Amino acid sequence: GKVQIKDQMINLENLSMKALDAMMRTSLLYKGDSSIDGYAGFNFDIYKINIGKLVTFIPELDTIVPMLRSFKGLVNFNIAAESRLDSLMNIRIPSLRAAVHIKGDSLVLLDGDTFRRLAKILMFKNKKENMFDSISVNITVDNGAVKVYPFVVEIDRYRAAVGGTQNLDMSFNYHVSI
């Protein structure tokens, strides 16, 4: 990759690395407007990362997509985003604009109670294994709202379409079709 530092700006182009047992690639532009305010815009791709490590690595994901903590497995994660930063370089969530894509196969739902209730209601063939065959999700964040675009999730013999909106205050409106 390439790194440029000039005029209170840092530009990282096509940096690749291996960390957290995953391959990563990023491009980033940071501008320090003042000692208390900054801007960052970036594109970040992570391949085959453990979901738990992803949420630990990017804690803001837990605010934006709290459902991620309910799964175990490997996913590919892509995000393009821009945001204002505070004096500690933390993302100012209200200014965040982002597009996220998460794709994973053979993911396990960790919340056993939720799975047991679903398995009973939907009469799953396999009531013990809470494996999702595949998930591919597209999400945007803008004006304090998270929009989850309709996506298909496969579990047991069912295929469900899920989509909706979630506000950063954790209120939500989702639609599920089976």
Regions inferred by a protein language model and the residue ranges of each:
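Membrane-proximal interfacial segments on either side of biological membranes
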Residues: 1-132, 158, 163-178
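Generic long, charged, amphipathic alpha-helical segments
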Residues: 127-144
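Extended serine/threonine-enriched, polar tracts that run as long, contiguous segments within proteins
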Residues: 141-148, 152-169
